[in-house]
């Protein structure tokens, strides 16, 4: 138990954390299946880590385009990886699988009025398959994930860990740890298949611990240690994933990182499609950079 948390809000957050920790291992990708994808050769016939990562980047682009919540993106990635870790998917079918997972996540987390029509989603994504194809693939995905769409995600842990840490920070220092920056870092990690092998709690705390260490927020170090102990995360695991997160973020900000196809991000839309799309579809059309810290 985290003894210093005595307020009602803190106790509610802690109760939520305990519930997430209890459910964490349910509805996660099969690690053995992810390893098979990582070891596959890129011969155009088998699913590879590179193809998976590019598909996730496309889903992130769609999330930004429609202005959907990060939890929607997180759930879409979870569904995609759960399916890919169970099934042998041919590269030519990946687009339909990815969009089906995305649509399931959208319908599960977003308000009904914000859910796009399947026809619009396919047009915006520039795929050639039909609505019937998408619906058939949705059913296949649902069957393979045992109709369990909801899952515990690293984003949920990131939100809770951040809120719990903020409870123990003096009011004048509450803005020091930038949640938007942490959120962007998590999105970058989602675009690498290796992080789907990490427990959601470990990935979330690794990102926070790394940021606190990098920005020298000494007053938050003890709070991270308490969260680590409460979540039963070993120091070895935390260090291992921190190093991988650090490497990922370094590559993300360098020329080595394979950026999403800029041309595709322009989303060439026909006049007819543009007239049919809802106004809310034009909220965001670019990928965000990881925000700088406030001096």
Curated annotation (Swiss-Prot):
The keyword Cell cycle applies. CDD domains: CYCLIN_CCNG1 (cd20583). Keywords: Cell cycle, Cell division, Cyclin, Mitosis, Nucleus. Pfam families: Cyclin_N. The keyword Nucleus applies. One of its GO terms (molecular function) is cyclin-dependent protein serine/threonine kinase regulator activity. One of its GO terms (biological process) is G1/S transition of mitotic cell cycle. InterPro entries: Cyclin, Cyclin-like_dom, Cyclin-like_sf, Cyclin_N. GO terms for cellular component: cyclin-dependent protein kinase holoenzyme complex; cytoplasm; nucleus. It is found in: Nucleus. Its main location: nucleus. May play a role in growth regulation. Is associated with G2/M phase arrest in response to DNA damage. May be an intermediate by which p53 mediates its role as an inhibitor of cellular proliferation. Belongs to the cyclin family. Cyclin G subfamily. This is Cyclin-G1. It comes from Bos taurus. The gene is CCNG1.
């Amino acid at each position: 138990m985290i003894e210093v948390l005595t307020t009602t809000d803190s106790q509610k957050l802690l109760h939520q954390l305990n519930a997430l920790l209890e459910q964490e291992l349910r509805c996660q990708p099969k690690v053995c299946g992810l390893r098979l994808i990582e070891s596959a050769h890129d011969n155009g016939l088998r699913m590879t880590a590179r193809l998976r990562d590019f598909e996730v980047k496309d889903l992130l682009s769609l999330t930004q385009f429609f202005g959907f919540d990060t939890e929607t993106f997180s759930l879409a990635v979870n569904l995609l990886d759960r399916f890919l870790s169970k099934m042998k998917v041919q590269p030519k079918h990946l687009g339909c699988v990815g969009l089906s997972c995305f649509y399931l996540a959208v319908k599960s987390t977003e308000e009904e009025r914000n859910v796009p029509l399947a026809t619009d989603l396919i047009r915006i994504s520039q795929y050639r398959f039909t609505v019937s194809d998408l619906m058939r693939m949705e059913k296949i995905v649902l069957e393979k994930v045992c109709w369990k769409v909801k899952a515990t995600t690293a984003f949920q842990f990131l939100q809770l860990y951040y809120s719990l840490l903020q409870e123990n920070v003096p009011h004048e220092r509450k803005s020091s740890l930038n949640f938007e920056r942490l959120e962007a870092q998590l999105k970058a990690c989602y675009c690498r298949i290796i992080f789907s092998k990490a427990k959601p709690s470990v990935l979330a705390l690794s990102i926070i611990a790394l940021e606190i260490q990098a920005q020298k927020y000494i007053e938050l170090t003890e709070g991270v240690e308490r969260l680590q102990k409460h979540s039963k995360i070993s120091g070895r695991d935390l260090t291992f994933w921190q190093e991988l997160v650090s490497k990922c973020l370094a590559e993300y900000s360098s020329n080595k990182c394979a950026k999403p196809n800029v041309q595709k991000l322009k989303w060439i839309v026909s006049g007819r499609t543009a007239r049919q799309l809802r106004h809310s579809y034009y909220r965001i059309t670019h990928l965000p950079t990881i925000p700088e810290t406030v001096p």
